[in-house]
């Protein structure tokens, strides 16, 4: 699923998890915690995209063929994506039904 249009919302949701994304994660990377109260939203968003956005960029690159098959040119140009897989458990769905469920 292409996420380009919702990355700001995804960053705002991550911003709510202060201890995980500013304290623990930054400590793991740099050996100290960040103080988000001293950061502007632009600084926070840049930090979140640098450390969390790459997983969505990697997903878009790895799923490029599927994105193109599902979204055409938009899939070719997508920067961020979230990937899902069909589960072997529960109700079986076809690829077409799965794509329909994932459409915005």
Give residue ranges: language-model regions.
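C-terminal accessory domains and tails appended to enzymatic cores
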Residues: 1-104
């Amino acid at each position: 699923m292409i996420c380009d249009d919702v990355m700001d919302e995804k960053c705002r949701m991550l911003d709510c998890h202060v201890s995980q994304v500013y304290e623990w994660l930054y400590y793991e990377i740099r050996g100290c915690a960040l103080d988000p109260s001293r950061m502007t939203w632009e600084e926070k968003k840049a930090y979140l995209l640098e450390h969390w956005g790459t997983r969505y960029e990697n997903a878009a690159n790895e799923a490029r063929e599927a994105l193109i098959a599902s979204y055409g040119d938009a899939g070719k140009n997508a920067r961020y994506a979230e990937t899902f897989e069909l589960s072997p458990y529960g109700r079986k769905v076809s690829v077409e039904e799965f794509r329909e469920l994932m459409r915005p």
